[in-house]
Structure formats: C-alpha cells, structure tokens
C-alpha cells in the first residue's frame, strides 16, 4: 500500500502531494479568472483563513485551492518531501 504524502499549505491545512498539478501566483488576470470560474462552479477551496491569497494550487480533479503561503515556500515543501 502506497503512503500518500501531505503537504502543509498553511494554518493547519494540508493537501495530498500527488494530486497537485500546479502552484501559481494569483496576480495575473488568467489566474483571477480561474479563481472566479472555480468559485462559480463550486470547485474553489479557500485555505487562507481570511488572509491575502499568495498562491493558487490546481489539483488533478480541477479543484482550485487558495493559500496564503508564497508559491516558492510551497514548492520548497514539495521538494523536501521528494528528497530533492
């Protein structure tokens, strides 16, 4: 049985590492549209605890997860889990 790795995305929130396909900055217009489309379709998960959104994670199930942790920090956590 394979063990799924959990990655901390801030404030006690975790995501399965194998399900994440992208970590992006929320500042661009396409990412703002992605967030609004996900909200309208019920695919948005807000893990910011009311703080500013600093990164957007996209999963293989097309869910969009908002995090208040910088994309670089989250990618470092992925790299640590991978042993890179």
Curated annotation (Swiss-Prot):
<comment type="similarity">
    <text>Belongs to the RemA family.</text>
</comment>
<dbReference type="Pfam" id="PF04025">
    <property type="entry name" value="RemA-like"/>
</dbReference>
<dbReference type="InterPro" id="IPR007169">
    <property type="entry name" value="RemA-like"/>
</dbReference>
<protein>
    <recommendedName>
        <fullName>Putative regulatory protein Ddes_1405</fullName>
    </recommendedName>
</protein>
């Amino acid at each position: 049985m394979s063990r799924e790795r959990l990655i901390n995305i801030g404030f006690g929130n975790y995501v399965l590492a194998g399900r994440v396909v992208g970590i992006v900055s929320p500042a661009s217009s396409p990412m703002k549209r992605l967030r609004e489309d996900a909200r309208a379709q019920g695919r948005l998960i807000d893990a910011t605890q009311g703080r500013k959104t600093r990164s957007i994670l996209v999963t293989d199930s097309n869910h969009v997860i908002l995090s208040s942790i910088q994309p670089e920090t989250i990618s470092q956590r992925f790299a640590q889990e991978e042993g890179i």
